[in-house]
UniProtKB/Swiss-Prot annotation:
Keywords: Membrane, Nucleus, Phosphoprotein, Transmembrane, Transmembrane helix
Gene designation: ARL6IP6
Modification Phosphoserine, positions: 2, 36, 60, 65, 80
Protein name: ADP-ribosylation factor-like protein 6-interacting protein 6
Main location: nucleus
Region feature Disordered, mapped onto this chain: 1-26, 62-81
Compartmental location: Nucleus inner membrane
Topology of this chain in the membrane: Multi-pass membrane protein
TM regions (residue ranges): 111-131, 150-170, 205-225
Length: 226
């Protein structure tokens, strides 16, 4: 062992306890190239650096394209554009209050339209009830004291079918708009291809109840007019 080697080995021992030891990056020799472990580490570090650079480039390109696509709002009094107050995908309380303030007229209008529709439906049902009551009261008695209605068979059948079809159509429309997939067209209760795949059964109970409502309405009107 030479004095130079002993001096190199004893140099770290002569450092003070509080002095940080500089760590040099290991340099790989020519013999570590090829299929060795050193080349894998170098290639992995270079690959990570390349991935980081690609991610930075994508983020910068995405942010710049978003700024170009987003419309700039009207400038404020000082000339600076007003941007939406949104941080981390969440609007602030002021922005939420403004959205609610803009939305309440639409909600009030929808409530008024619903009330108007309910009033019109009630008026239509009241008029229908009065007509049915008058037709049921105007019966004639023949010589054998048997009540004979003014309506014939075909008139009674047409009125009953019209009432049943109207009730069935209304229930069908309500079920269609209230279903979990209102975009499915046509709204049929029998759709084994798609409905069975989604729910496990091929018959929609809501549509069957709509058909049952129409049948019951037709029978009720026919019984009242007889």
């Amino acid at each position: 062992m030479s004095f130079v080697e002993s001096g190199r080995r004893s140099a770290p021992l002569r450092r003070r306890p509080g002095t940080p030891v500089p760590f040099a990056r290991p340099a790989y020799s020519v013999f570590s190239q090829g299929d060795s472990w050193g080349e894998g580490e170098v290639e992995e570090e270079e690959g990570c650096d390349q991935v980081a650079r690609d991610l930075r480039a994508e983020f910068s390109a995405g942010s710049s394209s978003k700024l170009r696509k987003d419309p700039v709002l009207q400038p404020d009094g000082d000339g600076s554009p007003v941007l939406p107050d949104k941080r981390n995908g969440i609007f602030s309380a002021d922005a939420g209050g403004k959205a609610l303030a803009r939305r309440w007229p639409v909600q009030v209008l929808s409530i008024l339209c619903s009330l108007l529709f309910a009033i019109l439906l009630a008026c239509l049902l009241a008029i229908t009830y009065l007509i049915v009551k008058e037709l049921h009261a105007e019966n004639l008695k023949n010589e054998d004291d048997v009540n004979t209605g003014l309506l014939g068979f075909w008139s009674l059948l047409i009125i009953s079918l019209t009432a049943g079809f109207s009730c069935c159509s209304f229930s069908w429309t309500v079920t269609y708009f209230d279903s979990f997939e209102p975009g499915m067209f046509p709204p049929t209760p029998l759709s084994p291809a798609r409905f069975k795949k989604m729910t496990g059964h091929s018959f929609h109970m809501g549509y069957s109840m709509a058909i049952l409502n129409g049948i019951v309405a037709a029978l009720t009107v026919a019984w009242c007019l007889m």
